[in-house]
């Protein structure tokens, strides 16, 4: 595409390609490659699909002096990341109750666009949640203190401020506390089927044959 400053690199196989006919996400990869200060390449991972500006699954790095910051490039759920929860359950134990577990997860975790969470907060509580992060949820009984040791920044950004959170954002965010979301948001019950690095796995307390939950 005219104006591309770097190449586009897309990590997919033939099987994924079949499902992408008519999808404009390839064009979005090219569009990202035209942005000022982009470095090396406009990259897309295997979960690529159409987004707001960037494709979902898009990755781009920009020069700190000449690049751009695009908060709404993919969407508005900034800091949408992935968290792995370890467990002491073996695969055999979970398989016995697989159907029941699946039903309970769906019954207790609201999913989809426009769903409302079961955790009810006042605006004052919501403000505290935004400023204190996971620490607030632990104090509210939704986790244990040890959990915080395994979360980036201990689950709380020290400089977090409620000052610039507008009324519309509060209105949208309050009912969504405790929901999973939609699109490419997911919850998977997984098995550690193979260990590739014993030392690293030991640090994360990952054991072969045991169950983890990826959110």
Predicted regions and their residues:
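Glycine-rich, flexible loop motifs
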Residues: 1-39, 68-72, 78-208
């Amino acid at each position: 595409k005219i104006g591309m400053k770097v190449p586009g690199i897309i990590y997919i196989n033939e099987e994924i390609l079949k499902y992408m006919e008519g999808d404009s996400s390839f064009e979005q990869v090219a569009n990202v490659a035209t942005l000022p200060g982009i470095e090396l390449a406009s990259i897309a991972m295997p979960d690529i699909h159409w987004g707001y500006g960037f494709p979902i699954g898009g990755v781009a790095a920009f020069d700190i002096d000449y690049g751009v910051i695009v908060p709404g490039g993919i969407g508005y759920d900034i800091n949408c990341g992935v968290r792995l929860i370890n467990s002491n359950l073996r695969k055999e134990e979970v398989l016995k109750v697989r159907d029941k577990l699946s039903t309970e997860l769906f019954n207790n975790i609201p999913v989809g666009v426009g769903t409302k969470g079961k955790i009810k907060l006042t605006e004052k509580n919501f403000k505290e949640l935004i400023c204190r992060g996971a620490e607030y949820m632990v104090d509210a009984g939704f986790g244990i203190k040890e959990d915080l040791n395994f979360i980036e920044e201990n689950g709380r950004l020290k400089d977090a401020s409620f000052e610039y959170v507008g009324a519309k954002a509060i209105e949208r965010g309050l009912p969504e506390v405790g929901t999973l979301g939609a699109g490419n948001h997911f919850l998977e019950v997984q098995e550690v089927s193979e260990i590739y690095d014993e030392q690293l796995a030991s640090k994360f307390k990952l054991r072969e044959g045991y169950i983890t939950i990826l959110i």
